[in-house]
Amino acid sequence: MEKKLAILTSGGDAPGMNAAIRATAKIAEYYGFEVYGIRRGYLGMLNDEIFPMTGRFVSGIIDKGGTVLLTARSEEFKEARFREIAANNLKKKGINYLVVIGGDGSYRGANLLYKEHGIKVVGIPGTIDNDICGTDFTLGFDTCLNTILDAMSKIRDTATSHERTILIQVMGRRAGDLALHACIAGGGDGIMIPEMDNPIEMLALQLKERRKNGKLHDIVLVAEGVGNVLDIEEKLKGHINSEIRSVVLGHIQRGGTPSGFDRVLASRMAAKAVEVLNKGEAGVMVGIEKNEMVTHPLEEACSVDKRKSIEKDYELALLLSK
């Protein structure tokens, strides 16, 4: 029986997705799979945007941000009748293997294809938010972190010149990993993340102490899951006398050349994904834990909120920000 494997990217784009597409295609070909690409994620599967993927298609993309397969969100895919159409579009081409690169929403769609239609699916975690359970790191997190650090350095220049307190809102959805790591690596002076209580009075007290100790500017990292940074700015104004500004980094965090770490991680995850499918396993995601490649059921990845033990890192960030 001929083995045919399709690749799609879904949800928000993340640096490293192209490296994962490239490695998946190359390794799948090595194992004897005929490789197909699906444009625009599940929307493209539904609209039959499925095409044979040649080696030329993945040539020269390892260092490119975004995704050459494009990505989109599909509300229709949440309905069983549309998922059946999408699955049939695969089956009529003889495709029974699928690698899905994306976040938890992408995993839910993949798990339904596996459960309802028997499509042999493996997920690769691609999201800058680092909010997928079953893996220490997701594709794009490291690159995004470095983008934030670069922005912090520039913002610190103006904060220092004007003796200001600047709040920087970063992405992450419900997870504070980006803000936490950026605070530690970038020498942040305060942090607010959704996993921990964030009383404005505590932050204000910390900033006042910095002023007493002769510090004349502050950089505070605010994870988007905490709330609107402008609201936080207004509340903080009632507690401290220094001039406050807010910066929302926004979609610059999604783009850029993927870091070496993300390219290697993408390649390792892709190799594991194809290896798993070649062995006849499916319905799982691949991840990295303690530098080892692992798999976990997609169902588990979809149903469990990622709750890492972040207390020690949070305490470290607070200690270093004094």
Swiss-Prot record:
Q: What gene name does this entry carry?
A: pfkA
Activity regulation: Allosterically activated by ADP and other diphosphonucleosides, and allosterically inhibited by phosphoenolpyruvate.
Which positions are annotated as binding ATP? G12, R73, S74, G103, D104, G105, S106
Q: What Enzyme Commission number does this protein have? A: 2.7.1.11
State how it assembles: Homotetramer.
Which species expresses this protein natively? Fusobacterium nucleatum subsp. nucleatum (strain ATCC 25586 / DSM 15643 / BCRC 10681 / CIP 101130 / JCM 8532 / KCTC 2640 / LMG 13131 / VPI 4355)
UniProt-annotated catalytic positions: D129
Residues annotated as binding substrate are T127, I128, D129, R164, M171, G172, R173, E224, R245, H251, I252, Q253, R254
Q: Where in the cell is it found?
A: Cytoplasm
- Keyword vocabulary terms for this entry: Allosteric enzyme, ATP-binding, Cytoplasm, Glycolysis, Kinase, Magnesium, Metal-binding, Nucleotide-binding, Transferase
Name the enzyme group at the top EC level.
Answer: transferase
Record-linked SUPFAM superfamilies: Phosphofructokinase
Q: Name one GO biological process term.
A: canonical glycolysis
Q: Which HAMAP family match?
A: Phosphofructokinase_I_B1
Q: Which reaction does it catalyse?
A: beta-D-fructose 6-phosphate + ATP = beta-D-fructose 1,6-bisphosphate + ADP + H(+)
User: Main subcellular localization, coarse class?
Assistant: cytoplasm
Q: Quote the pathway field.
A: Carbohydrate degradation; glycolysis; D-glyceraldehyde 3-phosphate and glycerone phosphate from D-glucose: step 3/4
An example Gene Ontology molecular-function term: 6-phosphofructokinase activity
Residues annotated as binding ADP are: R22, A23, T24, A25, K26, R156, G187, G188, D189, K215, L216, H217
Q: What is this protein called?
A: ATP-dependent 6-phosphofructokinase
Cellular component (GO) terms are: 6-phosphofructokinase complex
UniProt family annotation: Belongs to the phosphofructokinase type A (PFKA) family. ATP-dependent PFK group I subfamily. Prokaryotic clade 'B1' sub-subfamily.
Give the required cofactors: Mg(2+)
